[in-house]
Amino acid sequence: MLKGIIFDMDGTLGDTVTLCVEAYRQTTLEVSGRLPAAEEVLGLFGISDRGVLGGLLGMRYDDPALPIDHFVEVYERLHDTLAPTPYEGAVEALRSIKAKGLKVGLLTGKEHYTADPTIARYGMSGLFDLVLTGKPTHNCKDECLLEAMRAWGMAADEILYVGDAPTDIEHCHRVGVRIINAAWGSHAAAEAEACLARNPDYRLTRFSELEPLITKLLS
């Protein structure tokens, strides 16, 4: 029986992938004078804020000189232009899911540096029963899903994850959690083949399809 739903952020609750990419590119340019290609930035996704920034600048993620504060300033500066609002119906969906008696979580590759500003801007503060963030050393979503199970006292088949990336599908399969492949973002078409090859349990191309599926799974 479904008891909890955990959401990814970037490309799932908001079309924020371009925001993230451009914030990393602009920060790298301002700090080092080098403008990395979007593909270089995307190739580092999966690890968290400090990991990506360190990779672009040739620095360790735990280097005290890593300009993480500068990155956050750039991220927030670009936010209202590149990703001003969440996907239509996202906030209402979170509230509706909670009203059904389900636990609602957020599991994102972001760290608090960028997760917190986006949650606040999108009016989602207080809507998550659990917030789990990424690590700068490796993609840890499978570990975080296990942590969510322990925190909520739930089995893998009682939790559903909603995420857009091919690696999200891999990590869910690894720990036995069902996944809805969120294929409604601007980057979904580019990743469609990779996502389908990993056999997600469900794949939706419109956010409006999410609630009806959840209702069906609860019946």
Where is each model-derived feature located?
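N-terminal helical cap/lid subdomain that shapes the substrate entry/recognition surface
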Residues: 2-9, 13-92, 100
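Phosphate- and divalent-cation-binding pockets in alpha/beta enzyme and binding domains
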Residues: 23, 52, 114-117, 171, ...
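Substrate-recognition/cap helix-loop segment adjacent to the acidic, metal-dependent catalytic center
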Residues: 29-31, 52-61, 98-105, 109-139, ...
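Surface-exposed amphipathic alpha-helices with a cationic face
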Residues: 91-98, 169-173
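Acidic, Mg2+-coordinating phosphoryl-transfer loop and its flanking beta/alpha structural elements
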Residues: 160-202
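Short acidic-hydrophobic, aromatic-tinged amphipathic segments that line or gate anion-handling sites
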Residues: 202-209
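Short amphipathic alpha-helix with an adjacent loop that forms part of the alpha/beta core around
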Residues: 210-219
